[in-house]
A protein has these predicted regions:
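N-terminal "domain-start" segment that seeds a small globular fold
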Residues: 3, 16-54
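Compositionally biased, low-complexity intrinsically disordered regions
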Residues: 10-16
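A short, hydrophobic beta-strand/beta-hairpin element that forms part of a small beta-sheet core
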Residues: 40, 145-149
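Short active-site neighborhood of thiol/selenol oxidoreductases, capturing the structured segment around
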Residues: 53-77
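Short, well-ordered coil/turn elements that cap or connect secondary structure elements
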Residues: 58, 90, 120-122
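Typically the conserved alpha-helix immediately C-terminal to a functionally engaged Cys/Sec
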Residues: 73-88, 108-111
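Thiol-based oxidoreductase modules, predominantly thioredoxin-like and allied folds used
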Residues: 92-108, 123-132
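Short, internal strand/loop/helix patches
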Residues: 115-146
């Protein structure tokens, strides 16, 4: 996947931390600006399809949102998260949400509950479950919500 920033011809997918909104006790870290976007392969909780970085290869950019259902910060902005998907679906920008919480510790974040959240908010983008938290770790997403562009 390639990202075109500032009119520069695309070379390689780069991660740009867009916004860092985290709980006061959980510091968020960022990958260095310009880091190649880590590959991922995760199930969409709604369709069951496997979503990868390559899924968005024809998009101008990809917004990755690490969110979950139980987080009070996500609850506060969940309608705006849904609106982002609707606003950008026809602008050639890919959007994906990923939940990496342990469903054993947070039952509200199991795949069935995530699907209910997607249904409730009518997401227009895939909502994936990162059961092993490997994708979140590769992006250094330490809390929710964490946004990467």
């Amino acid at each position: 996947m390639y990202l075109n920033v500032g009119g520069v011809p695309p070379r390689a997918a780069k991660v740009v931390p867009l916004v860092e909104v985290c709980g006061a006790l959980t510091p968020s870290t960022m990958l260095p600006l310009g880091t190649k976007a880590p590959e991922f392969s995760l199930p969409d909780v709604v369709s069951g399809d496997t979503i990868t970085l390559d899924t968005f290869k024809d998009k101008k950019a990809l917004l990755m949102m690490f969110i979950c259902r139980h987080c009070p910060f996500v609850q506060h902005v969940k309608n705006e998260i849904a609106k982002i998907g609707k606003d950008y679906q026809n602008k050639n920008v890919g959007v994906v949400a990923i939940s990496a919480n342990d469903a054993g510790s947070y039952s509200e974040d199991d795949p069935d509950s995530l699907k209910e959240m997607e249904d409730e908010l009518d997401f227009t983008f895939p909502y994936c479950y990162d059961e092993t938290q490997e994708v979140a770790k590769s992006y250094t997403a330490a809390c929710t919500p964490d946004f990467f562009l």
